A protein has these predicted regions:
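N-terminal binding-site loop/beta-alpha segment at the start of enzyme catalytic domains
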Residues: 1-71
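Structured C-terminal cap/extension of enzyme domains
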Residues: 4, 39, 43-44, 173-187, ...
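Glycine/proline-rich, positively charged
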Residues: 26-29, 36, 40, 80-186, ...
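Conserved residues at the C-terminal ends of beta-strands
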Residues: 19, 49, 104-107, 140, ...
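Short beta->alpha linker loops
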Residues: 50, 54, 77-80, 107, ...
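Short hydrophobic/aromatic-enriched beta-strand-loop microsegments
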Residues: 70-73, 156-164, 235-241
Length: 281
């Protein structure tokens, strides 16, 4: 398994890391067991968010027994005001049992915050960084134009965006643009919200990019075992796998539900995400 350097952050980890959204669905004892097994197996980058209920708490419980400099924490805030930002950052630090977060990200951004834009939000990031509470400033997005604007701004060190072998050519260009600008690219939804069911194919696809860091959602020990097995024997993007991917693209690519749930709640009470995924059945 090769290493990835996340742009100007200088963070260097294996190209096979942990997305902690799904860990919120697991009871604390089991989640702690999974997280510590991940760490012991070579996973050293863990991505979470203030919005992921008790995910941060579980990470703090599991990882605080290890030297802090031996792993990286990325978290996120959906705050809309400086007051919310500061409160959420302090909560995240407490939950994670740490005095700093390696990458703090604006979560599911609908705008690219900038200095002097009147919101005070980017200034909050700068203040937190100056105070040593965060090390690097990142942004996560689900909209292509927001992601492009974030790269063009030159204000963010990392971009987190949905990316898998079902991604479009436009999303591939996003990866290329991040590389050109030495901006770290964190790939969420590497299994396309569950549409992709062969982890070895998903992993093999990612290995062709030297600037993409996939974070895999894990909630069962047997799932973790699959990802850890790739640390020693990394899947290769063979002609057979390429052909499989092309066939999958023909059947599944295009507009589809990744299962993120950010379309919810619906004011009319409609389960939008469930309806969207039923259309694929």
């Amino acid at each position: 398994m090769k290493d990835i350097i996340l742009g100007t952050t200088g963070i260097q980890v294996r190209q096979n890391e942990f997305g902690a959204l799904t860990i919120q669905r697991v009871e604390i004892p089991e989640s702690v067991k999974i997280l510590r097994k991940a760490y012991d197996g070579g996973i050293k980058f863990f991505d979470t968010a203030r919005a992921y209920s008790d995910s941060e708490v579980k990470l703090g419980e599991a990882l605080s027994i290890y030297p802090r400099e031996s792993y990286y924490l990325a978290s996120k805030t959906m705050a809309k005001t400086p007051e919310e930002f500061k409160a959420q950052l302090e909560t995240s630090l407490t939950n994670l049992k740490t005095d700093y977060i390696d990458i703090f990200q604006f979560h599911c951004a609908n705008q690219v915050f900038k200095p002097n834009d009147g919101t005070g939000m980017y200034e909050c990031m700068l203040e937190a960084k100056a105070a040593g509470k965060i090390r690097h400033i990142g942004i996560t997005a689900h909209k292509l134009q927001i992601a492009m604007d974030a790269i063009d701004s030159g204000l963010y060190e990392t971009l987190q965006f949905p990316f898998s072998y079902l991604s479009s050519d436009k999303e591939l260009k996003l990866v290329e643009k991040c590389k050109e600008n030495n901006m770290g690219f964190i790939a969420m939804k590497g299994l396309a919200g569950g549409l992709i069911n062969k982890s070895e194919v998903a992993m093999a696809y990612m290995t062709q990019f030297d600037n993409v860091l996939p974070i895999w959602g894990v909630q069962k020990e047997k799932e973790l075992d699959e990802w850890l097995s790739y640390m020693e024997t990394t899947p290769v993007l063979s002609d057979e796998i390429k052909a499989y991917i092309e066939n999958e693209k023909k059947e599944l690519a295009g507009d589809f539900c990744r299962g993120c749930g950010y379309c919810m709640p619906c004011p009319a009470g409609i389960m939008i995400n469930q309806c969207a995924r039923m259309s694929l059945m």
